[in-house]
Amino acid sequence: MAPALLLVPAALASFILAFGTGVEFVRFTSLRPLLGGIPESGGPDARQGWLAALQDRSILAPLAWDLGLLLLFVGQHSLMAAERVKAWTSRYFGVLQRSLYVACTALALQLVMRYWEPIPKGPVLWEARAEPWATWVPLLCFVLHVISWLLIFSILLVFDYAELMGLKQVYYHVLGLGEPLALKSPRALRLFSHLRHPVCVELLTVLWVVPTLGTDRLLLAFLLTLYLGLAHGLDQQDLRYLRAQLQRKLHLLSRPQDGEAE
């Protein structure tokens, strides 16, 4: 039992790292653009147009750096999700395979956020500066971001957050209960294999709904939108399963409790 108990601290460390990275990601994608905005460097008049920006090394260099960071994150996230890599990590790390995947993803995302280069002199796709837009647009964006993050946290709980973070696998292993996914129905497993990111719409809202969409933010939003779109493969069978599960849950919630029935 001692070797099994050693797995628990490793899984908890991975979870804490992922949780801290999630908090930092909220700050990076929401609080900084909504409360801090793009760092000023001479005001909007100092920003270049799109054609001029394509010839300016001071803009292209940080843009290429940010692109490299995003490709590093996407590459790690996709490579470790491949079946061959998952089989290899499962062979050598056993029940910690999911925790390892979560920890590596968190570290890759930390690199993106820590070394991200803003481009204050770059062109912007849109910007709310004139009143009343300078007051109401940030407020509307803030409300939509709060709603989106609340929905994201709620959906993660519904989609078995402990299993997604690798905690449930270790817990079941220590208690000798086997693999958690083995207890799920084939239709649920099929859905999970197609729906790698169950919070796609909410993340897209966070990425795109900002008062100022500058060059680096446009790169971040575009590439992550493209990646999220390619990672989804839902079909009609998955949608029918989701509809049936939703109807079943609504039916259970609408049933009167024992005390109320009496």
UniProtKB/Swiss-Prot annotation:
Residues 29-58, 115-133, 211-216 are perinuclear space. The keyword Disulfide bond does not apply. Signal peptide: none annotated. GO terms for cellular component: nuclear envelope; nuclear inner membrane; nuclear membrane. Residues 1-4, 81-97, 165-191, 235-262 are nuclear. InterPro entries: Nurim-like (IPR033580). The chain crosses the membrane at residues 5-28, 59-80, 98-114, 134-164, 192-210, 217-234. It is a multi-pass membrane protein. It is found in: Nucleus inner membrane. Keywords: Membrane, Nucleus, Transmembrane, Transmembrane helix. The keyword Transmembrane applies. Belongs to the nurim family. This is Nurim. The gene is NRM.
